[in-house]
């Protein structure tokens, strides 16, 4: 059975970059009729917060991304300890004691000599007595996995054939000196224990994947299929990493972005398929194909979400926005007509209130100097109301007959006087909703 996972760290709110990873894994699982696991990477007790666990779940639920089970790494520490013991037994795990300053100095020396900055495995030469002395002086060391210095190869679902020389990679630290288990080994143990068959993540994890493949092999396991998607950039190709804090899903939700607009964009971004609005998740699942994604950096512009949101709102029946209409005071018997007019002229639901204020209170007239006499005369022909769908046609016909104006010279000044805008909804429908026309006096 196809099994995928999304493994966020509860150290902050998830953003569009996280969503891209979550969505790809979710769509693969759902298309195959498989299992999607939400795995909380909470092995860092200082930075992990329960409020962020709740927030992650809320954001995924808002989007309609459902999971089949939840796993928490903090509840699996015994399994990671077992894996570490096995690596020690087979001679693939060793303790190292260098300080960050010492490691940095080594890296600088290697770079100055034109060599790759790879850990030199000096700790392997330490005697037991030297290790005891260092522990007494510095405390417990970190535990590194000893890589076999050979090429690590796999066929990536997006990047194609990958080959990495392990000799160019430092032996990864899997356990810190304070005993904290790091992502690299926790993820390996979880993926094998949980039967994960496909792992989709960012291309910044490629080297990590290479080391994890060796760790899995050392523990006696094969590895899942890997696919590494491109990283997001800003609209001008600039690094997006520094802006991701402003692109949290809850911020987009607060700004009025609708889930299907966001999902429609993220499901196609970086693929050879055009971005098209989809109105339900089943359509996204059916149309998803990991093979259509490329390796080039992918531009993301949050502004693209608003036209998609506007188009999505146009598909909604009035019943789905009743609570929003109630909140701004639209009478129940007016809601259907108001929504029919407003939905074609809003970007987000936040825009509804402005249109209702216009209908309820009227608009500040926009009248050019050369049209003042014309508008004054036209307003004498506009009855008090209430208005209906025929009022605009009858009024403009009367104004045309009285003034001789026609076409744009007739309709545009009247629209601007009534609505304060040069463009907007069909005036027959809008005037029927208006309770006040300020230009009438």
From Swiss-Prot:
Can you name one GO molecular function term for this protein?
tRNA binding
- Where does the chain bind ATP? 242
What Gene3D superfamilies does this protein's entry cite? 1.10.10.350, HUPs
Give EC number(s), comma-separated.
Answer: 6.1.1.17
One of the GO biological process terms? glutamyl-tRNA aminoacylation
Q: One GO cellular component term, please give it.
A: cytosol
Could you tell me which InterPro entries the record lists for this protein?
aa-tRNA-synth_I_cd-bd, aa-tRNA-synth_I_codon-bd_sub2, aa-tRNA-synth_I_CS, aa_tRNA-synth_I_cd-bd_sf, Glu-tRNA-ligase_bac/mito, Glu/Gln-tRNA-synth, Glu/Gln-tRNA-synth_Ib_cat-dom, GluQ/Sye
Enumerate the catalysed reactions: tRNA(Glu) + L-glutamate + ATP = L-glutamyl-tRNA(Glu) + AMP + diphosphate
Q: Where is it mostly found?
A: cytoplasm
Which residue numbers does the motif 'HIGH' region cover?
A: 8-18
Could you tell me where this protein is found in the cell? Cytoplasm
This protein's UniProt keywords: Aminoacyl-tRNA synthetase, ATP-binding, Cytoplasm, Ligase, Nucleotide-binding, Protein biosynthesis
Q: Where is this motif: 'KMSKS' region?
A: 239-243
The record's similarity note reads: Belongs to the class-I aminoacyl-tRNA synthetase family. Glutamate--tRNA ligase type 1 subfamily.
Query: Subunit structure, per the record?
Result: Monomer.
What is the role of the protein in this entry? Catalyzes the attachment of glutamate to tRNA(Glu) in a two-step reaction: glutamate is first activated by ATP to form Glu-AMP and then transferred to the acceptor end of tRNA(Glu).
Task: Tell me the protein's name.
Answer: Glutamate--tRNA ligase 2
């Amino acid at each position: 059975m196809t099994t995928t996972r999304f493994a966020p760290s509860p150290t902050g709110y998830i953003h569009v970059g996280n969503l891209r990873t979550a969505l790809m894994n979710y769509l693969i699982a759902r298309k195959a009729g498989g299992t999607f696991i939400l795995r909380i990477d909470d092995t860092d007790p200082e930075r992990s917060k329960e409020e962020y666990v709740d927030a992650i779940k809320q954001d995924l639920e808002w989007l309609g991304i459902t999971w089949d089970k939840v796993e928490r790494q903090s509840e699996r520490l015994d399994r990671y300890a077992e894996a570490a013991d096995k690596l020690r037994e087979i001679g693939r795990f060793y303790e190292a004691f260098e300080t960050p300053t010492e490691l940095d100095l080594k890296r600088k020396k290697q770079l100055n000599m034109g060599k790759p900055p790879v850990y030199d495995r000096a700790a392997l030469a330490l005697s037991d007595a030297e290790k005891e002395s260092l522990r007494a002086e510095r405390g417990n060391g970190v535990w590194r996995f000893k890589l076999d210095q050979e090429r690590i190869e796999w066929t990536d679902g997006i990047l194609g054939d990958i080959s990495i020389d392990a000799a160019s990679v430092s032996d990864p630290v899997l356990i810190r000196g304070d005993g904290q288990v790091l992502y690299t080994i926790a993820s390996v143990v979880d993926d094998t224990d949980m039967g994960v068959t496909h792992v989709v993540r960012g291309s910044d994890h490629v080297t990590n994947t290479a080391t994890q493949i060796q760790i899995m092999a050392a523990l006696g396991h094969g590895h899942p299929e890997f696919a590494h998607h491109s990283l997001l950039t800003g609209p001008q190709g600039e690094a997006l990493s520094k802006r991701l804090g402003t692109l949290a899903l809850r911020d987009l939700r607060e700004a009025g972005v609708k889930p299907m607009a966001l999902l429609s964009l993220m499901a196609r971004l970086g693929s050879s398929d055009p971005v098209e609005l989809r109105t339900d998740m089943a359509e996204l699942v059916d149309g998803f194909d990991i093979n259509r994604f490329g390796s080039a950096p992918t531009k993301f512009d949050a502004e693209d979400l608003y036209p998609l949101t506007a188009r999505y709102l146009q598909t909604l029946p009035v019943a789905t926005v009743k609570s929003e209409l109630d909140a701004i005071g639209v009478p129940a018997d007016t809601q259907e007509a108001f929504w029919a007019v407003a939905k074609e002229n809003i970007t987000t639901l936040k825009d509804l209130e402005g249109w209702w204020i216009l209908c309820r209170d009227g608009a500040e007239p926009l009248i050019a100097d050369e049209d003042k006499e014309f508008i004054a005369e036209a307003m004498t022909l506009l009855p008090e109301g209430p208005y209906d769908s025929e009022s605009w046609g009858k009024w403009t016909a009367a104004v045309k007959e009285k003034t001789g104006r026609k076409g744009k010279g007739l309709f545009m000044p009247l629209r601007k006087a009534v609505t304060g805008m040069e463009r907007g909804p069909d005036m027959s429908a809008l005037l029927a909703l208006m309770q006040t026309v300020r230009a009438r006096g």
